[in-house]
Curated annotation (Swiss-Prot):
STPGR repeats lie at residues 180-205, 216-241. GO terms for biological process: cell differentiation; spermatogenesis. The gene is CIMAP1A. GO terms for cellular component: cytoplasm; cytoskeleton; outer dense fiber. 'Shippo' is a Japanese word for tail. This is Ciliary microtubule associated protein 1A. Outer dense fibers are filamentous structures located on the outside of the axoneme in the midpiece and principal piece of the mammalian sperm tail. May help to maintain the passive elastic structures and elastic recoil of the sperm tail. Pfam families: SHIPPO-rpt (PF07004). Belongs to the CIMAP family. Microtubule inner protein component of sperm flagellar doublet microtubules. The keyword Cell wall biogenesis/degradation does not apply. Keywords: Cell projection, Cilium, Cytoplasm, Cytoskeleton, Developmental protein, Differentiation, Flagellum, Repeat, Spermatogenesis. It is found in: Cytoplasm; Cytoplasm, Cytoskeleton, Flagellum axoneme.
Length: 254
């Protein structure tokens, strides 16, 4: 074996671990489920009752009432506080002084016109601004309807005539060379009013259907390689070496 030529970097050596393909039965990878305990127990056996041990419960405190932090007022009863009237002393309120008119604010000499008869008095004031911004339309703001023409309103209108320009057709200045000639009119087809003659169309030559696929020629065949009708020597083919660790494929043909 030392004289053989090795291909690649692989060299024969002992396996570093167990190869599972070498074992014909389930190896240590498949463990039988245990019959004791609670986790992963075998389903084929009856399971006995399991008990668990727990620590001792904590003892409650002897005094469960609130401590001295909560001092209940002895004057508070179930109906409320049992207290006498209590008063508090506050400062004086600030009173707001009202401004009243004094003796100099009155004019008794002007009260004679309210008690005795007095002559009428007039006052001259400036002109008001309401006349300047008056939006009432003036005489020139109205547009009276027309009394002449065909569009009168509330009046009977007379007949109106319009004068039109002279027509260029048939006048002395009409150019007769621009009139259409006999060739400008389309002649009516006779077959529209008369019997229509039969019409024929000539089509291209019709080829019969055939096979246009490419066929092999004489040079495409190799009669010397035919071994079905002639005896030939046995032929051997080289295959690959199958591994001893590969499971063969078994197909159920039934």
């Amino acid at each position: 074996m030392a004289e053989e030529v090795w291909v690649g970097t692989w060299r024969p050596h002992r396996p570093r671990g167990p190869i599972m393909a070498l074992y014909s039965s389930p190896g240590p990878k498949y463990l039988i489920p245990p019959t004791t305990g609670f986790v992963k127990q075998t389903p084929t056996k009856l399971r006995a009752p399991a008990y668990s041990f727990r620590g001792a419960p904590m003892l409650l405190a002897e005094n469960c009432s609130p401590g001295p932090r909560y001092s209940v007022n002895p004057k508070i009863l179930r109906t409320g506080k049992d207290l006498g009237p209590a008063y508090s002393i506050l400062g004086r309120y600030h009173t707001k002084t009202t401004l009243t008119p004094g003796p100099g604010d009155y004019f008794p000499e002007k009260s004679t016109k309210h008690v005795f008869d007095s002559a009428p008095s007039h006052s001259i004031s400036a002109r008001t601004k309401t006349f300047r911004v008056d939006s009432t339309p003036g005489p020139a703001a109205y547009m009276l309807p027309m009394v002449m023409g065909p569009h009168t309103i509330g009046k009977v209108s007379q007949p109106s005539f319009s004068i039109k320009g002279r027509s260029k057709l048939g006048s002395f200045s009409d150019d007769l060379h621009k009139t259409p000639g006999p060739a400008a009119y389309r002649q009516t087809d006779v077959q529209v009013t008369k019997f229509k003659a039969p019409q024929y169309t000539m089509a291209a030559r019709v080829e019969p259907p055939g096979d246009k696929t490419l066929k092999p020629g004489p040079g495409a065949h190799s009669p010397e390689k035919v071994t079905m009708t002639r005896p030939c020597a046995p032929v051997v083919s080289f295959g690959i070496k199958h591994s001893d660790y590969m499971t063969p494929l078994v197909v159920d043909v039934d």
